[in-house]
Curated annotation (Swiss-Prot):
Record's keyword terms, sorted: Heme, Iron, Metal-binding, Nodulation, Oxygen transport, Transport
Family annotation (Gene3D superfamilies): Globins (1.10.490.10)
Protein name (Swiss-Prot/TrEMBL): Group 2 truncated hemoglobin 3-1
Binding partners and assembly: Homodimer when ferric.
GO BP: any one term: nodulation
Known role: Hemoglobin-like protein that exhibits an unusual concentration-independent binding of O(2) and CO. Required for general plant development and during nodulation. May promote shoot organogenesis from root explants.
Domain of life of the source: Eukaryota
Induction data: Down-regulated by nitric oxide (NO), particularly during nodulation mediated by Sinorhizobium meliloti inoculation.
Entry GO MF terms: heme binding; metal ion binding; oxygen binding; oxygen carrier activity
Listed PANTHER family: TWO-ON-TWO HEMOGLOBIN-3
Length: 170
C-alpha cells in the first residue's frame, strides 16, 4: 500500500524532495514576517469572495481574520521562523484539523489556484522562493487529500481493511 507521501507525490506531480527543498533554506529569514502576513491576507481575500460557491462555503464557518492568522503563523513556523503557531494552537496536526472539511482533489486544485494567484500578486517574493513555496503547497495539499481520505475510510464502520463494504446492504 502506498504511504501518504507517495500518494501526495503521485497526485501533485511534485517529488517529495522538491516539496521539502524549503528545509534547505530559511525562507522566513529571506522574506520576513510581513511578507507571510501579506501572502495569507491576499490568499484569504480571494477565498472569501470566490465565485465558486462550493469552495467558498468550505470556509463559511471560519472567521477570516483568524484564518489569516492561523495560516501565516503556521507558514512562519514551517519556513524557519519562530514557533508562533504552536505557541498559540499546539501541534499543527494538519490532517486531523482538516478532517471536518471536504478536502477533495477538486478543492486542492481550487486552493492551489488561489495560492498561486496570491503569490503572483506579492512582488517582494523572488521567483525561486515562489517555486519552492508552490512545490511545498502542491505536495501538502495532496498530502491532506490523501490523509483525510484515509482517516475517513479507517473510521468508516461499514468498511473493512480491504476496502470491502460488509454492511453495504443494511
Ligand atoms: C487542499 C485544500 C485545502 C482546503 C480545502 C483547506 C481548508 C481549510 C479550512 C476550511 C480551514 C479552517 C480555516 C481556519 O479557521 O483556519 C483550514 C485551516 C488551515 N489550513 Fe487548510 N485547506 C487546504 C489546504 C491547506 C494547505 C496546503 C495548507 C498548508 C500548506 C493548509 C494549512 C492550514 C492551516 C495551518 C490551517 C489552520 C488550522 C487550525 O489552526 O485550526 N491548508 N484549511
Amino acid at each position: 500500500m502506498q504511504n501518504l507521501q507517495e500518494k501526495a507525490s503521485e497526485w501533485s506531480g511534485v517529488e517529495t524532495n522538491h516539496a521539502f527543498a524549503i528545509d534547505d533554506t530559511n525562507l522566513f529569514q529571506k522574506l520576513g514576517l510581513q511578507t507571510f502576513i501579506n501572502l495569507s491576507t491576499n490568499f484569504y481575500n480571494r477565498v472569501y469572495v470566490d465565485d465558486e460557491e462550493w469552495f467558498r462555503s468550505i470556509f463559511a464557518k471560519s472567521d477570516k481574520d483568524k484564518a489569516i492568522q492561523n495560516q501565516y503563523e503556521f507558514l512562519v513556523q514551517r519556513m524557519g521562523g519562530p514557533p508562533l503557531y504552536s505557541q498559540r494552537r499546539g501541534h499543527p496536526a494538519l490532517i486531523a484539523r482538516h478532517r471536518p472539511f471536504p478536502v477533495t482533489h477538486e478543492a486542492a486544485e481550487r486552493w492551489l489556484l488561489h495560492m498561486q494567484q496570491a503569490l503572483d500578486n506579492i512582488s517582494d517574493i523572488d521567483h525561486d522562493s515562489k517555486i519552492m513555496l508552490m512545490n511545498f503547497f502542491r505536495h501538502t495539499a495532496y498530502f491532506l487529500v490523501a490523509g483525510v481520505e484515509q482517516k475517513n475510510q479507517s473510521l468508516h464502520p461499514c468498511k473493512d481493511a480491504d476496502g470491502r463494504h460488509p454492511c453495504k446492504n443494511f
